[in-house]
């Protein structure tokens, strides 16, 4: 299916790995020119080579830490005319209330929670001036299925869910759309590394990590490209009446028992 996205431009944060690069690839496959943002230049260079080698689109990269709002300003000044913004940067540490110090909590939220808010503030204004644009916030299932052992992440994602709904609810008045995606367990490098560490600790064999996937819906974690495909669909005009809502992609896990 042609999503009629060819020639548009998307800026994706957290774009060098996992859901970020999968989203960039799915958009590039539809002919979207992509701007990749993450903190590590080497990873960005690899991502650029990968996408440019597979798709006939323009690929630009910026190594920025988006917990610093000055870098958000730099991006908006350099790329004021983007059509699609995909917020994906940020990893919030696990742990209960006593395990996460104030400094760790604030640092994590500066990147993900306030990073998303700052990106939306700047790029929403630019899009509004042109009366068109789509913002897609990649959130996390912990925002709807609360977990005391991931309290900073659950609270942060819940806050961003509310933010996305509040902003997207009236975005149509400005010619824009704002939507969110709540991924469940997704087989990113980060998740696989965590599961290998757990398998080594529990079984003495990191290669048994896939055994932890069996309790998940359908007996597996989701694939990054399954999130990327939804990003492309939501970015397209096929989703022109979709705004102020959150799409959960977790195989049904939010309505089951514990994942692990």
Across the structure, where does each feature detected by a protein language model lie?
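Substrate-binding pocket helix/loop in short-chain dehydrogenase/reductase
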Residues: 96-97, 104-109, 212
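Conserved glycine-rich Rossmann-like NAD(P)H-binding loop of the short-chain dehydrogenase/reductase
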Residues: 30-46
